[in-house]
């Protein structure tokens, strides 16, 4: 396909559909809209103000905000001004913010919708100027209007070449310090043009943006997808208004992650208990009414493409949603391959597989069954880390994902684990913890899980409780957990069978450094946090332990 930059697509819609609504954002309960012409005007103005600063070309300019219209406007203005955008996760602590700003060598920081800017701002180095998005009152920042008032907009249609660096996207750091993934304009164009065509998306589609735009999946699907298609994006105002915002927006395309699907399931079961739901689904007429009502309640009644990604979604959860009329299509990709690897199409779904490769994408298995990917959208490398960049690629140019997989005779890929997560028990057998963790997803009392076992006789599962679990008595939890463990052990090999389930009172969050901003688990941090208890737990004859005197 012919190269088309994100800027060229903005100019196209500014010219061809100036009055069509591009962005919709609820502010204080009222919807605000921006047409393509209005977005382009704001982008041109901000780009002019950025150029007036006299920064060297290709300077690194960071953004930190929850999703909103001005996140996209700011991103486009940065690249129009000739610079490189550095999107930062909006839910990080001050020390993490400081680390990424220093690693990225950012010269400027835009600050938008945040819950804890007053705590976070301590991590901003003194030499970095901060500019606030509109509709935000961020202390210590120059206001949007003040920054823009004195400078002329850019009126010409500036272009950026395919090989230029567009953005540095920092990985969430589940296994150590975050790495800056360098992505070119060619990567953004190649992935978006191929993916949207393969998925059959058009300008009539509607996106709903709530997962962080700083994450590559949301950015490619929602920001780049809408930009290349000329489609509409609606935002969620807050967690409290999420349900109202999505039902009002009626998205045709929706991207979820494991945790969101679990929350949706818990919300449905809180209104319709599983036994009652089972009975209703067995009666055809009632079943159809129930399915329609559930989809409408979720805001997915108009959705034709429902995706899940970022981390594996358990088979049981996918099957549960399919049974109630929500067909979820699995996908698989990483930041380093610009969110372009494998996708499940609706007409050919295999539960437990993440589909076949996208067009113009090669996927193969290397040593240790490592999944390796090659296409024109791969990263240039990790910023200022040449050794890690060299390690990330094979000699023939494939990106080494670090994930393990299996490819069946039809070309479908199944993720089986992560090479670095494998541990060896005292019996000398290797265990893939993620495969065991996935089995917990069908049990409604569990919110989070991490399987440990390096050097132990048998693996253990550390779990936190869901709202359903927290409402149960200690003895009921003990009984349910014991049954749950027996059921799982029946399907596991002898060396994989769980010896203990440890019920933790402490939840794992970004604030206590046990979750990264992507909300996966920081396995190493969790293991270190509870390591002092391992010997006592292993020697105990009790199968179900409660920590911190839970309940």
Write out the residue ranges for each language-model feature.
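Conserved AMP-binding/adenylation subdomain of ANL enzymes
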Residues: 189-206, 213-293, 302
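Conserved ATP-binding/catalytic segment of the ANL
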Residues: 357-359, 364-425, 442
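Conserved AMP-binding A3 loop
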Residues: 33-37, 166-192
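Structural core segment of the AMP-binding/adenylate-forming
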Residues: 53, 76, 80-146, 467
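Gly/Ser/Thr-rich phosphate-binding loop
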Residues: 252-256, 264-349, 362, 447
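Conserved AMP-binding/adenylate-forming core of the ANL superfamily
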Residues: 22-68, 72, 76, 93-98, ...
């Amino acid at each position: 396909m012919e190269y088309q930059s994100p800027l060229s697509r903005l100019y196209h819609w500014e010219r061809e559909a100036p009055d069509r609504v591009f962005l919709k954002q609820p502010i204080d309960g009222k919807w605000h809209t921006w047409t393509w012409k209005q977005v382009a005007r704001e982008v041109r103005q901000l780009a002019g103000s950025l150029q007036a600063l006299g920064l060297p070309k290709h300077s690194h300019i960071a953004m930190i905000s929850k999703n909103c219209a001005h996140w996209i406007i700011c991103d486009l203005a940065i690249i129009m001004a000739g610079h490189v955008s550095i999107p930062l996760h909006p839910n990080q602590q001050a020390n993490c913010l400081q680390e990424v700003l220093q690693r990225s060598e950012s010269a400027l920081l835009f600050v938008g919708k945040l819950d804890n800017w007053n705590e976070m701002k301590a991590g901003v180095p003194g030499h970095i100027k901060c500019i606030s998005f509109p509709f935000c009152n961020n202390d210590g920042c120059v206001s949007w209007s003040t920054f823009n008032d004195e400078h002329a907009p850019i009126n010409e249609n500036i272009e950026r070449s395919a090989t230029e660096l567009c953005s540095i996207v920092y990985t969430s750091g589940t296994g150590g310090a975050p790495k800056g993934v360098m992505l070119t304009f060619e990567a953004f164009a190649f992935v978006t043009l191929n993916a949207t065509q393969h998925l059959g998306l058009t300008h009539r589609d509607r996106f709903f943006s709530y997962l962080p735009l700083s994450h590559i999946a949301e950015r490619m699907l929602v920001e780049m997808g809408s930009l290349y298609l000329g489609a509409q994006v609606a935002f969620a105002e807050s967690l409290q208004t999420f349900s109202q915002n999505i039902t009002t927006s009626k998205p045709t395309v929706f991207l979820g992650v494991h945790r969101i699907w679990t929350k949706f399931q818990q919300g449905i079961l809180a209104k319709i208990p599983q036994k009652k739901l089972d009975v209703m689904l067995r009666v055809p007429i009632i079943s159809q009414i129930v399915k329609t009502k559930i989809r409408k309640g979720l805001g997915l009644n108009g959705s034709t493409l429902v995706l899940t990604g970022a981390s594996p979604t358990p088979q049981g959860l996918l099957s549960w949603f399919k049974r109630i009329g929500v067909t979820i299509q699995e996908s698989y990709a990483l930041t380093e391959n610009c969110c372009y690897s494998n996708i499940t199409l609706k007409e050919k779904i295999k539960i437990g597989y993440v589909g076949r490769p996208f067009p113009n994408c090669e996927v193969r298995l290397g040593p240790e069954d490592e999944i390796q990917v090659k296409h024109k959208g791969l990263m240039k490398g990790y910023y200022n880390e040449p050794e890690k960049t060299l390690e990330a690629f094979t000699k023939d140019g494939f990106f080494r994902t670090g994930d393990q997989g299996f490819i069946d005779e039809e070309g479908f890929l199944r993720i089986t684990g992560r090479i670095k997560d494998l541990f060896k028990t005292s019996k000398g057998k290797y265990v893939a913890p993620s495969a065991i963790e996935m089995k917990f997803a069908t049990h409604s009392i569990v919110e989070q899980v991490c399987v440990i076992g390096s050097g132990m006789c048998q693996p253990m599962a550390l779990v936190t409780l869901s709202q359903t679990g927290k409402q149960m008595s200690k003895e009921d939890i003990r009984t349910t957990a014991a049954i749950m463990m027996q059921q799982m052990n029946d399907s596991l090999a002898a060396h994989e069978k769980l010896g203990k389930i440890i019920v933790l009172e402490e939840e794992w969050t970004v604030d206590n450094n046990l979750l990264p901003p992507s909300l996966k688990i920081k396995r190493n941090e969790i293991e270190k946090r509870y390591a002092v208890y391992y010997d006592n737990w292993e020697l105990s004859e009790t199968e179900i332990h409660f920590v911190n005197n839970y309940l």
